[in-house]
């Protein structure tokens, strides 16, 4: 296997390879609150490929909990239904080529799969400790004991496919709520998209997705702009309904009051994206901020909860119909996937899990929350680590528990929220991309299991911009493993599996929601490759008409220098050549002042470029220091001190070092941006270093300056800084020098 790139091998972007903030032990006996209060812990993950403890196999075990089988009324006399699930699965695969699909052709159901009344059979459910290959996360290179904080975060066995019910749940649905449920969900987006899609229209849209044929509509909405695409032939498919509040959304009765209380009316931006969210379209939202993050989280959690409840209640209703049907009545209800998990949240930190579960419990009243204390002790720490001097986006991401290797299953019943459920018995999976990859790749390579992702119907990536600063390959790995055909049956009742699952079209039915503070080429690639939903997709970006530069008030000259770069692939070479031939010679000509050295900070967004520049300076006459995400605390302190005192003329500083630490560097008189930072806040903060030096009188405003090297391949990054009204001229103009003050 090729080595993992990024921060320290597998970890990718850990917060400083040798400078992790805190240890796992800090979480033990942590804050114990009545609610999902914010808190924080972190640990340094081993950067080697640590082997995970494997649970022993066993032929005899008890079900995970007694409530799993309580609602499974069975009749063991029905020998036809007593066929092993593995036999059904094998026969189904052999006959798959004959199934009737939206594109034509026929499929003959396996002869032993009856269309008559189905009775669920008791299935043996091994506990997590009996699961072959169940990977448990290590702590400091050692396997956790069975009762630790991550013991159940494993992809354990399925329990009779999608067994959604606890004992007596169906009876708990009183007549009034049952009627309201039926009224609310009739002709709902859930019904049209998942439960009963029009087969002819589905076939047309799948064909257009294959041919990459989308009709497009531009939307000027909120404080941004959107592009709506639908794989349909008729322009009417681009029409959108108005969603001004939660009252305009088809919700389960038990969510209505809390939704109105928590969310109420939507603002302009929320009204722009709400139709896409609640109508199951894909959404790429490139305008996430600290201010709107909480509302976005609540909206998405409401949608996810509603989806789970609709799915479960549909299964309950069909179970009742099957139980009441007589043997001479043909009844087929396709209302399930291969496995139970339906929602996947890709989060950046454990504290983000705490915030997300806080949203869920605000929107749904649970009588009981199992393993809540254990969860808070492992995932939560007080959010008061940093002072207000740190930027708000930094504090939102890293305050509390900033550990970024985790995964946990969440099971929802009508009255209970159960944390630490095994993946195959979970409705929701909360995980970081790294944690999920570790779970899939652990153990014997021949027994790696990602089947628990086979029936994911909604995936949400909450902070794609933060994921970029870790290791984007982990996110790509997860998306590559979504909605694949399962390798094992997992006690699935294939007579209940929806046709589009069997036809391997689930990836085009799945809804994908990606939130980010800004968009980058990698995020756009994810959009083009994995967000191909038959319902359509919306890309929403901020309005960058004026750009960040018009809001800056430092009064410092900023010069943007365009260099020739004929190809995106050769751009790193062209940039390095330009830096060596144009930028370094100009730095060497700077006058030396009695107050210290020239104080030039070179900001390098890419670590690979940083290594290349640093190596090129080894044999030069420049006195320089360097700070990257891998530099240990002692060397960072020494580099900052020597640069501030003028002992070093240059300070090389990486974008990820700034992302993870937001150092306040003194002695900066001039800045060279080796490339345009993807995060526009970084430009403001680095420029602020020079502004503070001017305020302290260490350099005059005329002597201070900023130079930015850019090529035509950095259009997105440049637009966020200079604005869309200037970007065309700066990219295409004959001149290559552009000054701003």
Curated annotation (Swiss-Prot):
Q: A Gene Ontology molecular-function term?
A: rRNA binding
GO BP annotation list = maturation of SSU-rRNA from tricistronic rRNA transcript (SSU-rRNA, 5.8S rRNA, LSU-rRNA)
The keyword Ribonucleoprotein belongs to this UniProt entry's keyword annotation: yes
Q: Which organism is it from?
A: Leptosphaeria maculans (strain JN3 / isolate v23.1.3 / race Av1-4-5-6-7-8)
Question: Which coarse location class describes where this protein primarily resides?
Answer: nucleus
Instruction: Give start-end positions of Basic residues composition bias.
Output: 113-125
A GO CC annotation recorded here is: small-subunit processome
Stated name of the protein: U3 small nucleolar RNA-associated protein 25
Subunit structure of this chain's protein: Component of the ribosomal small subunit (SSU) processome composed of at least 40 protein subunits and snoRNA U3.
What family does this belong to?
Answer: Belongs to the UTP25 family.
């Amino acid at each position: 296997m090729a080595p993992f790139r990024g921060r320290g091998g597998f970890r990718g972007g850990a917060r400083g390879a040798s400078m992790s903030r805190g240890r796992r032990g800090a979480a033990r006996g942590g804050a114990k609150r009545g609610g999902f209060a914010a808190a924080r812990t972190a640990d340094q993950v081993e950067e080697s490929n640590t082997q995970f403890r494997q649970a022993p196999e066993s032929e005899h075990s008890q079900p995970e909990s007694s409530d799993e089988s309580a609602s499974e009324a069975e009749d063991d006399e029905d020998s036809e239904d007593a066929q092993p699930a593995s036999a059904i699965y094998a026969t189904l695969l052999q006959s798959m080529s004959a199934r009737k699909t939206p594109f034509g052709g026929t499929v003959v159901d396996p002869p032993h799969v009856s269309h008559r009344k189905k009775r669920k059979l008791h299935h043996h459910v091994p506990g997590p400790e009996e699961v072959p290959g169940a990977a448990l996360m290590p702590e400091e290179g050692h396997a956790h004991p069975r009762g630790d904080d991550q013991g159940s975060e494993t992809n354990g066995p399925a329990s009779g496919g999608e067994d959604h019910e606890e004992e007596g749940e169906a009876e708990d649905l009183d007549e009034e709520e049952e009627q309201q449920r039926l009224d609310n969900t009739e002709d709902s987006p859930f019904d049209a998209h998942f439960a009963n899609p029009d087969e002819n229209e589905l076939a047309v849209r799948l064909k257009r997705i294959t041919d990459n044929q989308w009709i497009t509509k531009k939307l000027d909405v909120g404080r941004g702009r959107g592009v709506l695409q639908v794989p349909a032939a008729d322009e009417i498919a681009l029409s959108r309904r108005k969603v001004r509040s939660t009252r305009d959304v088809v919700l389960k009765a038990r969510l209505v009051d809390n939704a109105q209380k928590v969310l109420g009316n939507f603002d302009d931006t929320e009204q722009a994206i709400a139709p896409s969210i609640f109508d199951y379209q894909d959404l790429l939202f490139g305008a996430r901020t600290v201010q709107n993050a909480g509302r976005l989280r609540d909206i998405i959690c409401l949608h996810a909860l509603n989806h789970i409840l609709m799915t479960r209640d549909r299964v309950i209703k069909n179970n009742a119909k099957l139980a009441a049907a007589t043997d001479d009545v043909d009844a087929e209800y396709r209302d399930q996937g291969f496995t139970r998990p339906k929602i996947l949240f890709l989060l950046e930190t454990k504290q983000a899990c705490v915030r997300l579960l806080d949203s869920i419990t605000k929107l749904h009243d649970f009588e009981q929350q199992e393993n809540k204390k254990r969860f808070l002790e492992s995932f939560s720490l007080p959010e008061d680590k940093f002072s207000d001097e740190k930027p708000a986006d930094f504090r939102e991401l890293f305050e509390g528990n900033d550990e970024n290797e985790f995964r946990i299953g969440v099971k929802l019943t009508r009255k209970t929220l159960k944390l630490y459920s095994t993946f195959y018995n979970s409705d929701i999976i909360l995980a970081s991309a790294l944690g999920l990859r570790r779970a899939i790749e652990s153990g014997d390579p021949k027994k790696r299991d990602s089947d628990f992702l086979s029936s994911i119907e909604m995936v949400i990536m909450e902070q794609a911009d933060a994921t970029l600063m870790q290791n984007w390959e982990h996110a790509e790995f997860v998306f590559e493993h979504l909605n694949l055909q399962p390798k094992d049956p997992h006690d699935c009742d294939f007579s209940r599996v929806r046709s589009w699952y069997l036809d391997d079209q689930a990836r085009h039915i799945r809804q994908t929601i990606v939130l980010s503070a800004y968009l980058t080429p990698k995020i756009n690639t994810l959009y083009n490759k994995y967000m191909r939903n038959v319902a359509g997709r919306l890309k929403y970006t901020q309005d960058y008409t004026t750009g960040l530069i018009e809001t800056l008030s430092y009064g410092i000259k900023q010069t943007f220098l365009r260099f020739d770069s004929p190809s995106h692939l050769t751009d790193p070479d062209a940039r390095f050549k330009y830096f060596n031939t144009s930028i370094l010679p100009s730095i060497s000509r700077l006058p030396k002042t009695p107050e210290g050295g020239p104080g030039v900070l070179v900001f390098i967004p890419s670590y690979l470029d940083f290594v290349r520049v640093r190596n090129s300076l080894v044999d030069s006459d420049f006195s320089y220091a360097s700070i990257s995400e891998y530099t240990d605390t002692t060397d960072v302190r020494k580099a900052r001190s020597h640069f501030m005192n003028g002992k070093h003329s240059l300070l090389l500083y990486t974008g990820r070092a700034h992302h993870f630490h937001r150092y306040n560097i003194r002695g900066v008189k001039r800045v060279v941006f080796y490339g345009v930072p993807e995060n526009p806040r970084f430009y403001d903060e680095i420029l602020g270093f020079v502004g503070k030096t001017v305020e302290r009188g260490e350099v005059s405003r005329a002597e201070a300056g900023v130079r930015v090297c850019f090529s035509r391949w950095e259009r997105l990054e440049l637009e966020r800084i200079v604005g869309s009204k200037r970007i065309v001229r700066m990219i295409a103009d004959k001149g290559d020098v552009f000054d701003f003050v």
